[in-house]
Amino acid sequence: MIKDIVVNLTIGVERDAAANYAVSLASIFKAHLVGVAFVYDPKVSANLIVGIPAELIEAQRAATKHLANEAVARFEELAKQAGVMTESQMIDVTPGHVGDTFGRLARSFDLSVIRQAEPNKAEQEVPIIEGALFESGRSVIVVPYVQTQGAKFNCVMVGWDGSRAAARAIGDAMPVLERAKMIEIFTVVAGPTKNTELPGIDIGQHLSRHGLKVEVKRIPAEGINVPEAILSHAADISADFMVMGGYGHSRLREYVLGGATRGILASMTLPTLMSN
């Protein structure tokens, strides 16, 4: 059951793909929705910035707060039009702590929704996604920044590699899978294999015991990178949602995204639920 959702509201944009998607998701599941807009406060680290007048720092903060207010207003209007119960929060934070802050906040919700970072822009979505994935203990749906449609589950792709993260993602995604019209479990084969057994059969049988109709397929990825192979296949079958484990590794006591996960997040074409 999905009863409450938290969405990171993107500031400084006219159309927030994450907010739009989260509102539609909350409407489908009759879930309570909380929108969070961060106000980035440079005053905390002002002692590290030599020679910048305090007035300029305060002006930067005021500008960020204005953008956060606008994001909240747009979100509340979207929710009102959809008849979704919501509340909004604005949280002061320094850029270096935004991921941890959102991760701790997301622990109290069934899942979080975050917009994909736009390429070549210095945005905070990546640390927020990392915080949600590695600090919250909950699943996160990342929405492409170009997404215009609301939540749909006509064709759901489910990534399977036998890992703990993949199993966790499938468990977290059950409310979505139960609404899916078509479910395809896919495994990626990066090169030639003599293994005649189709990976994913066991997890497919598990889902079938829940009354779900699934197909199991291999995605060949010889000669191309794994994210490219996955997203190409998603386009071929007109998938509108994907479920996968979110992978990372520890570095200096922090978790950072693994290569395949980072590749999907950089080039994603469909909303994707990730769990770790």
Task: Give residue ranges: language-model regions.
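Short histidine/acidic/glycine/proline-rich micro-motifs that form metal-
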Residues: 13, 62, 92-95, 118-120, ...
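Amphipathic coiled-coil/heptad-repeat helices and related helical stalk/stem segments
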Residues: 18, 98, 125-126, 166-169, ...
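P-loop/Walker A phosphate-binding loop and immediately adjacent motor/lid segment at beta-alpha junctions
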Residues: 80-81, 85, 123-144, 204-216
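Gly/Ser-rich helix-loop-strand patches that form or flank binding pockets
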Residues: 19, 24-28, 101-149, 233-276
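A short acidic, glycine-rich active-site loop
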Residues: 55-70
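Small/aliphatic-rich secondary-structure junction motif
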Residues: 1-57, 135-136, 152-219, 239
